[in-house]
Amino acid sequence: MELVMKDAPGALTVSETTFGRDFNEALVHQVVVAYAAGARQGTRAQKTRAEVTGSGKKPWRQKGTGRARAGSVKSPIWRSGGVTFAAKPQDHSQKVNKKMYRGALKSILSELVRQDRLIIVEKFSVEAPKTKLLAQKLKDMALEDVLIVTGELDENLFLAARNLYKVDVRDVAGIDPVSLIAFDKVVMTADAVKQVEEMLA
């Protein structure tokens, strides 16, 4: 199959299996959820009644005081007592095998093509690491919410994009399912397309 180049005459021949496959919504959902789960820190921690600071002594005798019976100042009912079902650090990551991950990326790329959200260019760069230059270039291309994918990370481009809201620059190794679906448009250089095909082959 062929994809039209935005900044050059002619078209780029690409793999049908990478850019022309059916959209597998269930697979994409599973991989995106797993990716987001893996990004969770999972470091929250609370103390149970066994872990909070305090004496093990019974605060007052069982009977005769008129007060409610109490066996420990560390009871969850008490102020500064332990938490009944205390949250503990945990690993939220989910296993996704390589075949599923690659399949999800292919599904997303194919859907981007179908929705005319994938823009192929011969090259994409700025002369200097200036936000103003990149902002003008994107304005000329009528792009606002965009992910720019290049074969190799262009430092000028990366620095120019840092201060632009809804603009991100990645190299091929840095793309993931979440970033590909998070932006309205994805601009990809011809070199990046070839690298993506090799990566997902």
UniProtKB/Swiss-Prot annotation:
Signal peptide: none
Example GO molecular function: rRNA binding
Entry-linked InterPro entries: Ribosomal_uL4, Ribosomal_uL4-like, Ribosomal_uL4_dom_sf
Region (Disordered): 45-73
GO cellular component, one term: ribonucleoprotein complex
Lineage: superkingdom: Bacteria
Key words of the record: Repressor, Ribonucleoprotein, Ribosomal protein, RNA-binding, rRNA-binding, Transcription, Transcription regulation, Transcription termination, Translation regulation
Subunit structure: Part of the 50S ribosomal subunit.
Function: One of the primary rRNA binding proteins, this protein initially binds near the 5'-end of the 23S rRNA. It is important during the early stages of 50S assembly. It makes multiple contacts with different domains of the 23S rRNA in the assembled 50S subunit and ribosome.
Family: Belongs to the universal ribosomal protein uL4 family.
Name of this protein: Large ribosomal subunit protein uL4
Source species of the chain: Yersinia pseudotuberculosis serotype I (strain IP32953)
Organism phylogeny: Bacteria, Pseudomonadati, Pseudomonadota, Gammaproteobacteria, Enterobacterales
Gene for this chain: rplD
